[in-house]
Structures are given as C-alpha cells and as structure tokens.
C-alpha cells in the first residue's frame, strides 16, 4: 500500500514542477484597481455597470475606472469630514450622526446628497428672529 501512495505523490510533484517551469515566463496578474492606483474594485464596478445598463451590457473599460475613482474620492471626502466631526465631539467612532453633520455642513456635498441619513438626527439651527435682541440694545 505504501508503494502505491508514494508513486502517486511522485507523479504529482513532477507535473507540478513542469507547470511551474511553464509559468516562469508569465507575469503575475495585476488588477485594474492597482493599475489605476485605486482602492475601490474596478472589476466589480465594471460588472455592475454592465448588469445595469440598457446598451446590451456594453460598457467601456475606462468608464469603470473613472466611476471607481469618483466613488473613492467622494468616500474619502465624506469620511474625512465625518472624522473631523467625531474628533470635535471627542469620540473615536464615526456614527451616522457624524456623517449627517459632515454632509450637511459642506454646501457641495449637501446639494449632492439630498437623501435622508438613517439615525442622523437634525442639524442644529436657530432662526435669526428667535435670537434675543436685548444683546443688540
């Protein structure tokens, strides 16, 4: 029995060694995200664009890279502002409230993201007519 098992392992090693010799000329695969210098998955975004488009699944290769870059930039921007908001409140964890304060505090992001953020609360605001006028006099 030991002879049969040993023979099979030897044969497997030789075929693995042969395939390793063939692969020496090939380069390691490089993802499109790393080629573009992005963290967001270009391949996944490309697949989702193809699934959701009306043009029979025809999406240009650069469209996915551009979309991934835009999403990564907007995410970084929102996370930076939310991190600043959480740091101002002396908290180490970003909550939906911090995201709400960050987005509504920035004029451009506020116009871009008009949806409701669950658990975000409301933005503190006191109308000018309600502020005491006694300090003026």
UniProtKB/Swiss-Prot annotation:
InterPro entries: Histone-fold, Histone_H2A, Histone_H2A/H2B/H3, Histone_H2A_C, Histone_H2A_CS. Keywords: Chromosome, DNA-binding, Nucleosome core, Nucleus. GO terms for cellular component: nucleosome; nucleus. One of its GO terms (biological process) is heterochromatin formation. It comes from the Eukaryota. Residues 1-45 are annotated as: Disordered. Its main location: nucleus. CDD domains: HFD_H2A. Residues 9-18 have a biased composition (Low complexity). Disulfide bonds: none annotated. It is found in: Nucleus; Chromosome. The keyword Nucleus applies. GO terms for molecular function: DNA binding; protein heterodimerization activity; structural constituent of chromatin. Variant histones H2A are synthesized throughout the cell cycle and are very different from classical S-phase regulated H2A. May replace conventional H2A in a subset of nucleosomes. Nucleosomes wrap and compact DNA into chromatin, limiting DNA accessibility to the cellular machineries which require DNA as a template. Histones thereby play a central role in transcription regulation, DNA repair, DNA replication and chromosomal stability. DNA accessibility is regulated via a complex set of post-translational modifications of histones, also called histone code, and nucleosome remodeling. The nucleosome is a histone octamer containing two molecules each of H2A, H2B, H3 and H4 assembled in one H3-H4 heterotetramer and two H2A-H2B heterodimers. The octamer wraps approximately 147 bp of DNA. This is Probable histone H2A variant 3. It comes from Oryza sativa subsp. japonica (Rice).
